[in-house]
Amino acid sequence: MFISIRRLVALVAITQLVASFSAVPVLVASHRLAKGLKEELNGSGPQAPESATNLIKRLVTECSSDEYLVINQPGLVLEDMTVNEADNWPFLRRYIAMASSVVGIPWVRGALDLDFIEQYIISTCHAETMNVVHDDDQEVGNYIDTRTRVIKIDLSELPPRSDLELRYSVIREHDELIRKIIRKLPSPHYTIILTSDMPQNVHPIPNMVVESQPDKYQIFHDLVNDPSRELEIERNDRFHQTIEPYWSPDRNTINRYMENKKKDEIHFFDYDLWTRNEKLILTIIVMVLTLFTFQLTKLVKLLTETVFKKDKGLITHTKSE
């Protein structure tokens, strides 16, 4: 009994539907090096949300970043982040290229718990949160301290892929928004976590196909899987020199007044005082010695004359007798 073409097509469609799964892409990029992140993944295929979350926790545990950008882009799929779509993400790709650690996961079976990730960063790195919910960089206020920040960005949903022109336009706007927010950061040490909270149906793709067409089935394959990244090295050493902060002295305080008063006091045996006024002191010493010598000479002369007169008087008196 032969199966009709229509039934065969329907059977294939049902088989694919049953085999498909819901997934979201996840991109993690850290300006500072975090070794061994990929050890948390199970092979190169679709990953469980727990594996992706453990990868992020391993990165966060080091608290090597001053800012953590947790970006939720509803409707984002792998096809939006391939090499072919590079022109839509000029600024994000620039930050990826600068990062020391980058991991791209094309498919995670289910959305990540971004609220849990936010709280984990806050509790682990003693951070505080800034929220961006209206696609406006002005929602990120000015920094008044050096505390670690979690900048949670909830972007507007992407238009459907049936209207690619509009979808690409919105992606470019969001890429520009990310650039504006990063430029506001006072520190270059940041981490980017980009994903979606809206899983999309994905048909399984054989590993052989994925490996043969990485530009199509990997997140920004040319950057994330660049051969230079096989060796985990810190790419931003020049930013990481430890510099002691300059603390401005207290102004108009009792402590400063007392310190200045002590500095203004003159101490006779102060070595610095003698060193600073060496020429003046030598001049005074010479003048004193000169005056002393002059007075001593006068005294000696006076004594000599007095003794001479007495001797002369004694001699005259003896002769008269």
UniProtKB/Swiss-Prot annotation:
<keyword id="KW-0325">Glycoprotein</keyword>
<keyword id="KW-0812">Transmembrane</keyword>
<dbReference type="InterPro" id="IPR037654">
    <property type="entry name" value="Big1"/>
</dbReference>
<feature type="topological domain" description="Lumenal">
    <location>
        <begin position="24"/>
        <end position="279"/>
    </location>
</feature>
<keyword id="KW-0472">Membrane</keyword>
<dbReference type="GO" id="GO:0006078">
    <property type="term" value="P:(1-&gt;6)-beta-D-glucan biosynthetic process"/>
</dbReference>
<keyword id="KW-1133">Transmembrane helix</keyword>
<keyword id="KW-0256">Endoplasmic reticulum</keyword>
<dbReference type="GO" id="GO:0071555">
    <property type="term" value="P:cell wall organization"/>
</dbReference>
<feature type="glycosylation site" description="N-linked (GlcNAc...) asparagine">
    <location>
        <position position="42"/>
    </location>
</feature>
<dbReference type="GO" id="GO:0005789">
    <property type="term" value="C:endoplasmic reticulum membrane"/>
</dbReference>
<protein>
    <recommendedName>
        <fullName>Protein BIG1</fullName>
    </recommendedName>
</protein>
<feature type="topological domain" description="Cytoplasmic">
    <location>
        <begin position="301"/>
        <end position="321"/>
    </location>
</feature>
<keyword id="KW-0961">Cell wall biogenesis/degradation</keyword>
<dbReference type="GO" id="GO:0009272">
    <property type="term" value="P:fungal-type cell wall biogenesis"/>
</dbReference>
<feature type="signal peptide">
    <location>
        <begin position="1"/>
        <end position="23"/>
    </location>
</feature>
<comment type="similarity">
    <text>Belongs to the BIG1 family.</text>
</comment>
<keyword id="KW-0732">Signal</keyword>
<feature type="transmembrane region" description="Helical">
    <location>
        <begin position="280"/>
        <end position="300"/>
    </location>
</feature>
<comment type="function">
    <text>Required for normal beta-1,6-glucan synthesis.</text>
</comment>
